[in-house]
């Protein structure tokens, strides 16, 4: 009995987009369908490693492409694992994959249709060339079913007990009138060679072969007799003597006979088994596209073999772009395909390379792993651990080779810089090598980025530390008050603008024996002359009373108030403890959906307020405190300085409303306006402005 189902909303939207929008590269549909067939063959082959019986009578795994000009259909058929009824319903219509929406967004943003395979929705590309698609599938665990849809928002599923499929899937495309070119033999051959040459299973194309054949008149007579049997009236002929007939020479003639047969289109042996010197760049690019579903060539390639006690061959590719879901925790990584003696085992072997290398694509073919190895055994397998170690080593070599070309490495770092940093955080064994791959903007690098090695070579005489600041953007950090004194002394400062930089700096303490120093934290000291040290001590003594008064006003909002060593032009800043979170890290943790509040309270240590004794505002505050410690304007000014310092130091205001009210009062005083409604002013934490408008105005104007 035929059942009708509605497409899931996002899938319906995707199909509508595919059908109603013009795309020039419609040819990719064949690549996607062949790729899906290859995956289906992979799955049944993997099952057969532990249970040979699953192959049954259909032990030859292959893919067939059959053009039918008479019926205007193109069929792609495989002997893979097939689909049950539930899988047909779910996989081809009612359950949207995670990539469906992402792919539509990519298309709307100007992306290429050929990206479709990367998002796991390649099947729907069939509707680029077909107005109706029929899928017949037979799985070992179910009877055969036929799925069919003309993309009108619904599809049907029908039991097909008399199906001739023993196991596998047959996809029949009923081609649109303007897409009949995909029935031409030459066109199909070119497409298979272009996109699917390195698929691991035979791709058999149904081709027509014309042969000339000599036939006798007897053959023609037989043919005529056959026609007669079909209803034609037989001709009356004179009966001749056999001997007389034999004496005559038999007449023959040549006729053209057209036959159909399947011809394998992908006869090349696996690329990784060949000598790298014999493989062209075009062949690597074609192979990469075949295994990755990418539409672009790879950025770089590493083809190598390891011999000795352990033997394996591998090809690693670095893509030009990062996949859209690279850091999704639920995403199953299928970056490197594992083969054992040319037999495909699996394509999502998470133990084959670490998470930070999730973007690397490729194949590994081991001579030593057992063919029937299970996922559970893989985790404990010593051979796999050695292979993993070698893959990481070769990947690092590949990155170093890319780094030799500045433009290529710029592309690489834009896409995969986060992965390098994740590697530093997670891979202690390779941390030193990975640090050499880091690039940062700095106060001296302009629009370019610098390496840590180059930074060290430019360090000033007497500079003992590698100075850095963390924040949201390069633009903000260039004007940060934290770097004022460092820049005045001619010290270069690294700008770290990605959230992952905070985690990286928790793991690294030095580079080439030069310690890292975060300018947003306590404990930063610059080399000073004896004269500078003497002046610093005098300032500490002179401003001790102001520091105490400011601490009394701010209470537990700050740990302490001290005279700053790092300020040059700003009046004050807020720094965090050496081992606590920086302002940038606080912001990152605030934005965590599942943050641990108790951990946040512990790590968000109290801040230290540093004041600049050379700044006019600070000097005036000092004068006021010394003249009258109970000056009511001082409290409001201290709070205003504190809130402003929170902002310039990268923190978030806990009470933006109070800050705004203080600013409004300042504006009123600047405009010589009376404060008509004291009731609207905040009671805490700032004190009210003094009652005498004239005196208050005078005081604020002096500060300004």
Swiss-Prot record:
| Residues making up the signal peptide according to the UniProt record | none
Identify the InterPro entries for this entry.
HATPase_C_sf, Heat_shock_protein_90_CS, HSP90_C, Hsp90_fam, Hsp90_N, Ribosomal_Su5_D2-typ_SF
Q: Which GO terms describe its molecular function?
A: ATP binding; ATP hydrolysis activity; ATP-dependent protein folding chaperone; unfolded protein binding
The family database entries (Gene3D superfamilies) matched by this protein are listed as: 3.30.230.80, 3.40.50.11260, Heat shock protein 90, C-terminal domain, Histidine kinase-like ATPase, C-terminal domain
Localization of this protein: Cytoplasm
- Any one Gene Ontology cellular component term annotated for this protein: cytoplasm
Q: Where does ATP bind?
A: 36, 78, 123, 375
Biased composition regions of type Low complexity, renumbered to the chain: 685-695
Composition bias, Acidic residues:
675-684
Do the record's keywords include Cytoplasm?
yes
Question: Which region ranges are annotated with the description Disordered?
Answer: 212-251, 675-704
Q: Where is the composition biased (Basic and acidic residues)?
A: 227-238
Keywords carried by this UniProt record: ATP-binding, Chaperone, Cytoplasm, Nucleotide-binding, Stress response
Which SUPFAM superfamilies does its entry note? ATPase domain of HSP90 chaperone/DNA topoisomerase II/histidine kinase, HSP90 C-terminal domain, Ribosomal protein S5 domain 2-like
Name the residue ranges of motif: TPR repeat-binding: 700-704
Functional description taken from the UniProt entry: Molecular chaperone that promotes the maturation, structural maintenance and proper regulation of specific target proteins involved for instance in cell cycle control and signal transduction. Undergoes a functional cycle that is linked to its ATPase activity. This cycle probably induces conformational changes in the client proteins, thereby causing their activation. Interacts dynamically with various co-chaperones that modulate its substrate recognition, ATPase cycle and chaperone function.
Describe the family membership recorded for this protein in Swiss-Prot or TrEMBL.
Belongs to the heat shock protein 90 family.
- Domain comment in the entry: The TPR repeat-binding motif mediates interaction with TPR repeat-containing proteins.
NCBIfam families the UniProt entry points to: PRK05218.1 (NF003555)
Its assembly, as annotated, is: Homodimer.
Protein name (record): Heat shock-like 85 kDa protein
Species name: Trypanosoma cruzi
């Amino acid at each position: 009995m035929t059942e009708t189902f509605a497409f899931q909303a996002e899938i319906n939207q995707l199909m509508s987009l595919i059908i109603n929008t013009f795309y020039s590269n419609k040819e990719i549909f064949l690549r996607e369908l062949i790729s899906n067939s290859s995956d289906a063959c992979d799955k049944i082959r993997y099952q057969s490693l532990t249970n040979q019986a699953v192959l049954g009578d259909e032990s030859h795994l292959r893919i067939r492409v059959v053009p039918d000009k008479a019926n205007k259909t193109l069929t792609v058929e495989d002997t893979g694992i097939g689909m049950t009824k539930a899988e047909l319903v779910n996989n081809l219509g009612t359950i949207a994959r995670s990539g469906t929406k992402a792919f539509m967004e990519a298309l709307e943003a100007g992306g290429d249709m050929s990206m479709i395979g990367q998002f796991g929705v390649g099947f729907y590309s069939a509707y680029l060339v077909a107005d109706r698609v029929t899928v017949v599938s037979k799985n070992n665990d179910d009877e055969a079913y036929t799925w069919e849809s003309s993309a009108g928002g619904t599809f049907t599923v029908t039991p097909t007990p008399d199906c001739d499929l023993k196991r596998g899937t047959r996809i029949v495309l009923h081609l649109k009138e303007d897409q009949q070119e995909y029935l031409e033999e030459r066109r199909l051959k070119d497409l298979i060679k272009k996109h699917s040459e390195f698929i691991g299973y035979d791709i058999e194309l149904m081709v027509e072969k014309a042969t000339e054949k000599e036939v006798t008149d007897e053959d023609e007579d037989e043919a005529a007799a056959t026609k007669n049997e079909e209803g034609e009236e037989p001709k009356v002929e004179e009966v001749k003597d056999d001997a007389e007939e034999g004496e005559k020479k038999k007449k023959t003639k040549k006729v053209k006979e057209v036959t159909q047969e399947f011809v394998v289109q992908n006869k090349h042996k696996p690329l990784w088994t060949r000598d790298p010197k014999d493989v062209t760049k075009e062949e690597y690019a074609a192979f990469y596209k075949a295994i990755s579903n990418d539409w672009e060539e790879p950025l770089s390639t590493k083809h190598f073999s390891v011999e000795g006690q352990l033997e394996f061959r591998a090809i690693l590719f670095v893509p030009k772009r990062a996949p859209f879901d690279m850091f999704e925790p639920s995403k199953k990584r299928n970056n490197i395909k594992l083969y054992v003696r040319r037999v495909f085992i699996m394509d999502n072997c998470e133990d084959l390379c670490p998470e930070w290398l999730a973007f690397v694509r490729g194949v590994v073919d081991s001579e030593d792993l057992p063919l029937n190895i299970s996922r559970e055994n893989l985790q404990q397998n010593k051979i796999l651990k050695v292979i993993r170690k070698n893959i990481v080593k070769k990947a690092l070599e590949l990155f170093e080779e890319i780094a030799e070309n500045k433009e290529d490495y710029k592309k690489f770092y834009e896409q995969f810089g986060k992965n390098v940093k994740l590697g530093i955080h997670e891979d202690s064994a390779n941390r030193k090598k990975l640090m050499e791959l880091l690039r940062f903007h700095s106060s001296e690098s302009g629009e370019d980025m610098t390496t840590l090695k180059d930074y060290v070579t430019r360090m000033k005489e007497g500079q003992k530390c590698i100075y850095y600041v963390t924040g949201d953007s390069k633009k903000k950090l260039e004007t940060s008050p934290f770097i004022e004194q460092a820049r005045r002394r001619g010290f270069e400062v690294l700008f770290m603008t990605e959230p992952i930089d905070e985690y990286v700096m928790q793991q690294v303490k030095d580079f080439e024996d030069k310690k890292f120093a975060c300018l947003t934290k306590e404990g930063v000291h610059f080399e000073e002359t004896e004269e500078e040290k003497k002046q610093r001590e005098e300032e500490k003594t002179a401003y001790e009373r102001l520091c105490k008064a400011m601490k009394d006003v701010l209470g537990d909002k700050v740990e302490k108030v001290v005279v700053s060593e790092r300020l040059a032009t700003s009046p004050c800043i807020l720094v965090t403890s050496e081992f606590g979170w920086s302002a940038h890290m606080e912001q990152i943790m605030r934005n965590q959906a599942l943050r641990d509040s108790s951990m946040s309270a512990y790590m968000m240590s109290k801040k230290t307020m540093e004041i600049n004794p050379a700044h006019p505002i600070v000097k005036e505050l000092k004068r006021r405190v010394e003249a009258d410690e109970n000056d009511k304007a001082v409290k409001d000014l201290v709070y205003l300085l504190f809130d402003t310092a929170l902002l310039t130091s990268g923190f978030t205001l806990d009470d933006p409303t109070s800050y705004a009210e203080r600013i409004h009062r300042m504006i009123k005083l600047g405009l010589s306006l009376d404060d008509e409604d004291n009731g609207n002013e905040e009671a805490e934490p700032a004190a009210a402005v003094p009652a005498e408008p004239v005196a208050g105005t005078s005081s604020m104007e002096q500060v300004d």
